UniProtKB/Swiss-Prot annotation:
InterPro entries: AAA+_ATPase, ABC1_TM_dom, ABC1_TM_sf, ABC_transporter-like_ATP-bd, ABC_transporter-like_CS, ABC_transpr_lipidA, P-loop_NTPase, Type_1_exporter. Homodimer. The gene is msbA. It is found in: Cell inner membrane. The keyword Transmembrane applies. It catalyses: ATP + H2O + lipid A-core oligosaccharideSide 1 = ADP + phosphate + lipid A-core oligosaccharideSide 2. It comes from Polaromonas sp. (strain JS666 / ATCC BAA-500). One of its GO terms (cellular component) is plasma membrane. In MsbA the ATP-binding domain (NBD) and the transmembrane domain (TMD) are fused. This is ATP-dependent lipid A-core flippase. SMART domains: AAA. The lineage of its organism: Bacteria, Pseudomonadati, Pseudomonadota, Betaproteobacteria, Burkholderiales. It holds the Pfam family ABC_tran. It comes from the Bacteria.
Length: 589
């Protein structure tokens, strides 16, 4: 199976430092300077309020209960003001953070989708559609939310720690030395367990892709699975992958929980030491009750940010791992490359010169030193057994497949010299595998071009779809739904023919385009195709005699080579491979 999670080895990604990994995603989230400024400013204010809680306790305990020595009413008023400022700052920081996250997510998703539209087509052969969709839609959303929130929480906790530590040093620098011993140990725990979390996160991404792919396969093949009674096998496959994902999730939870538990134990050890030393100091009258309570309170307030810092490794690690999948999709997938030659409308002369295509190093050539010249306006029929190279041949023309060697020329210009957009504008494709967008009939027919309603209706009529339009209340504005599945196979294929008619390209490729049509529909569509091919270069792959017998020329292919060429009558008279195929039933298939 294919999947998306393999572009960068985990070991290579793990060798990058935390700051190197953050630097990779920073350009997408750095645009909203006002948002960052507001979030950081509000975070600083919220963090600075933390030491005021124990600071209010000290005078209250030392002097507050002595008559006329301290105004007790100042304490509740100060607390109200303190928590009002704190709450408002938290709200502003969260709102600004949401803006930063969503702006960055919009930018990152846009860049990823642009990459999907411009990437080499090997991307879609190497990776499953579920893995790509999971990365673009879910991974970057979860990753950006986790990472940005974790970074700001990290900043808030660090600032809170600094504020509290400053207050602790002011209160009792000797006790603070004991607390300081906690930080190296916590840092060591975070460093060790973060590496494990990163590895487990990458493995979980792969397992999630595998599971999503099984679901995707069973949705697409639901009829075949039921027809062949394969439910038990597919359920076993799904359960095996689900259990693998569950085990990885439990390992991640154990690492996360272990990090939190160890940090709390270290904090408890430090607190116990502080209390012991404070008791010794109180015997020497160097520590007041208020000072001791304020110190312990401030130290207890330290536990939350320290624990949070230990927990921050999990969302930061997971967020970075998720976002790096999107970055790897963009950075490690090369774009399609084209030349600069542009022509508004090609004449239609095509030449293949010693073209070979080898998909895998250890596999036989799909095309083997293939040479052929096609004149402008000629209708060429291509026949041959399955796997003979017919579809590979026509997919070379718009560069959906790249040749391994040789040259292909359109109007005397090497295909690689053509601008890709200009090159592909010269071709209209109709294949047996029809893909329609979840949009209106009009938009699907005019795909990539402005919608001319009269022209759309004309093309639909030429493709024998007038009857269907009359049955639809919305006419050409009817939404087709997922791949137009409410239409029959023949109707979808005729819709693809209408799309080709609308494009009005100088070169037409029909890849078994009438294979799903009934006899009545085929006769109507054949007439439309005959009109369509009258002034165009046409390449027709078909298994039906009616599709090829009127072609100007027929070529017979076998194992990536052309073994015969001529008209239908000439090839029958030659009594070779084509005549043999014809006698085996080609005329009836």
């Amino acid at each position: 199976m294919t999947q998306l999670s393999e572009p960068v080895p985990v070991s290579l990604a793990a060798r990058r430092s935390l700051w190197q990994r953050v630097a990779r995603v920073w350009p997408y989230f750095s645009g909203s300077r006002a948002g960052w400024a507001l979030a950081i400013g509000a975070t600083i204010v919220a963090s600075a309020t933390e030491p005021f809680v124990p600071a209010l306790l000290k005078p209250l305990l030392d002097r507050g209960f002595q008559r006329d020595s301290f105004n007790l009413w100042l304490v509740p008023l100060a607390l109200m003001l303190l928590f009002t400022v704190r709450g408002l700052s938290g709200f502003l920081a969260q709102f600004a953070l949401a803006k930063v996250t969503n702006d960055g997510l919009l930018k990152l998703r846009g860049a990823m989708f642009d990459k999907l539209l411009s990437a080499r087509l090997t991307l879609f052969a190497d990776q499953s559609s579920s893995a790509i969709a999971n990365t673009v839609v879910y991974e970057v959303f979860n990753g950006s939310s986790m990472l940005i929130n974790a970074i700001m929480k990290l900043a808030r906790d660090v600032l809170t720690l600094l504020a509290l530590i400053g207050y602790l040093v002011y209160l009792n620098w000797k006790l603070m030395l004991v607390v300081a011993l906690l930080f190296p140990a916590v840092a060591f725990v975070i460093q060790v367990l973060s590496k494990r979390l990163y590895r487990l996160t990458k493995e979980s991404q792969t397992a999630t892709d595998d599971l999503a792919y099984v679901v995707e396969e069973n949705v697409m093949a639901h009829r075949d699975v039921r027809l062949h009674g394969a439910q038990a096998g597919q359920a076993s496959r799904f359960n095996h992958l689900s259990n693998s994902l569950r085990r990885l999730s439990m390992k991640s939870t154990a690492a996360y929980a272990g990090m939190s538990a160890i940090t709390q134990v270290l904090a408890a050890m430090a607190l116990s030491a502080v209390i012991s030393i404070a008791l010794l100091q109180s015997a020497e009258n160097t520590t007041t009750v208020g000072g001791f309570v304020a110190f312990v309170t401030a130290m207890l307030l330290l536990i939350a940010p320290v624990k949070s810092l230990s927990d921050a490794a999990t969302p930061v690690t997971r967020g970075l791992a998720a976002l790096e999948r999107g970055l790897d999709l963009m950075n490690l997938t090369p774009d399609e490359s084209g030349g600069s030659f542009v022509k508004a409308r090609a004449h239609g002369d095509i030449e293949f010169a010693d073209v070979s295509v080898i998909y895998k190093a250890d596999a036989a050539a799909a095309l083997d030193q293939f040479s052929l010249s096609i004149k402008a306006g000629e209708t060429l029929a291509i026949v041959g057994a399955s796997g003979s190279g017919k579809t590979t041949l026509v997919n070379l023309l718009p560069r959906f497949v790249e040749m391994s060697s040789g040259n292909i020329y359109l109007d005397g210009q090497d295909l690689r010299a053509w601008n890709l957009a200009s090159l592909r504008a010269q071709f209209a494709f109709v294949s047996q595998h029809v893909v329609m967008l979840n949009n209106s009939i009009a938009v699907n027919v005019a795909l990539g071009q402005p919608v001319d309603r009269a022209r759309v209706t004309e093309c639909l009529a030429a493709a024998n779809l007038s009857g269907l339009l009359a049955e639809l209340p919305g006419g050409i504005d009817t939404i087709l739904g997922h791949n137009a599945m409410q239409l029959s196979g023949g109707q979808r294929q005729r819709l693809a023919i209408a799309r080709a008619l609308y494009k009005n390209a100088p070169i037409l490729v029909l890849d078994e385009a009438t294979s799903a049509l009934d006899t009545e529909s085929e006769l109507a569509v054949q007439e439309a195709i005959k009109r369509l091919t009258a002034s165009r270069t046409s390449l027709v792959i078909a298994h039906r005699l009616s599709t090829v017998q009127h072609a100007d020329r027929i070529i017979m292919m076998e194992a990536g080579r052309m073994i015969e060429s001529g008209t239908h009558a000439e090839l029958l008279a030659r009594n070779g491979a084509y005549a043999h195929l014809y006698r085996l039933g080609f005329r009836n298939t």
